[in-house]
Swiss-Prot record:
Residues 1-17 form a transit peptide. Disulfide bonds: none annotated. Its main location: mitochondrion. One of its GO terms (cellular component) is mitochondrion. One of its GO terms (biological process) is mitochondrial translational elongation. The gene is TSF1-2. It comes from Postia placenta (strain ATCC 44394 / Madison 698-R). Associates with the EF-Tu.GDP complex and induces the exchange of GDP to GTP. It remains bound to the aminoacyl-tRNA.EF-Tu.GTP complex up to the GTP hydrolysis stage on the ribosome. This is Elongation factor Ts, mitochondrial 2. GO terms for molecular function: translation elongation factor activity. Keywords: Elongation factor, Mitochondrion, Protein biosynthesis, Transit peptide. It holds the Pfam family EF_TS. PROSITE patterns: EF_TS_2. It is found in: Mitochondrion.
Amino acid sequence: MLAARFASRAFPRTRLYSTAPKRSLKELVTELRSQADVSPIQAGQALKASDMDVSKALLWLEKQRTQSAVKKAAKVADRTANEGLIGTTVLSSGVANGRRVGVRAAMVELNCETDFVARNELFANLLEDITHTAAFISEPANAETFMQPFSMETLQNAPLLSQTKPSQNGKATVSEAMRDLTGRVGEKISLRRALTVVRDPFTSSQPDLALRVAARVHQSVFNPTQGRIGSLALLALKSKRLSEAIASQTFQDDLDKLCQALGRQVIGFPTTCIRSPPGTTDEGALYDQPFSMFIGPGNDQSVGAFLQSWAQERSLVNKDEEQSAGVEVLEFAKWTVGDVV
C-alpha cells in the first residue's frame, strides 16, 4: 500500500492523448487569415467546406477565387480600358560599377478602366512584375534597331516573374495574374503594348564601345518606375579611352546625371525624333531642343551641342575623333497612357 501511495505521488496522473486536441474555429480562422487575405466569414466558410483543415481551406479559397475571377473577366471583356500606367525596368544598364555590361530593359503599358484602380497598389505591383518578366525573358534581336516590340501573346502566356517576390515565380502566367486582379478590383485589366531592348556586352575586341539605357516616367504614384508617361532612351559611347573613363566614379556620376536629364527632356518636351531632317528644323527633334532639363551649366545649348561639349570636357573626344567618338542618342521611345497603337 505504501508503495502504491508513493507511486501515485511520485508520478502524478496526467491525461494522455493519442491525437492532438481539437482546435477551436476561432483559432483556425486566425491561422487561415494569417496566410490568406480573406474576411473572418470567408475563412469560416472555407474551413467548414474543408473538414476544418487549414491546408485544404487554402486550396478551396484559391479555387473559389479563380472561378470568381473567370466570371468577372468574362463579364468585363467588352469594356474599354484606357486608363492605367506605363512601367519601366532596367535589369542591366550597359555601364555599371566601372565596367561595360549588357543592356536589358523593358517598358510596358498596363490598362484598366478607371484612374482609381490605376492608383491601386495591387495594380502597380502587377505592372512591376509584368515589366520585369518582359525584360527577363527577352532575347537579343537580330534587327536594325535595338528597341523591339514584344509579342503580347508571348508575354501573356509567360510565367509571371517577380523581382521582389521570387518565391511566387511560376505559380501563374501573366494572363492568369491579370485575370486574378480583375477578380479583386472588378475592372478589365489588359496589356496594350510592350517593348524591350536587349544587347549582350561588347567583346574585348571592341574596347572603345558601350551602350547605356536610360528610363524615365512622369506622374508616378506608388512606384518611381511607373507613371502616365514613360520613356526609354539608348545612348552609345565611343572613345579610345572609354575603359579609363568608365572606371572613374566621377564619370559614372556624370553619366547618370546626363541620362536622367535626357529622360526628363524626352518626356517634358514634345519630342518626336532625334534629329531634324536635312535642311529643316523640327521642334520635335531632340538634338535641336534647348537642353532645359539639364540642371547645371550648359543648359542654354541645344541637346546636340551639349552632348558634344560633354564628351569633349571628359576627354572622350579629341580633334582627330570628333566625327566618330563621343556620346550619341541612338534610339528612344516615349509613351503616354491611352495612346492609339
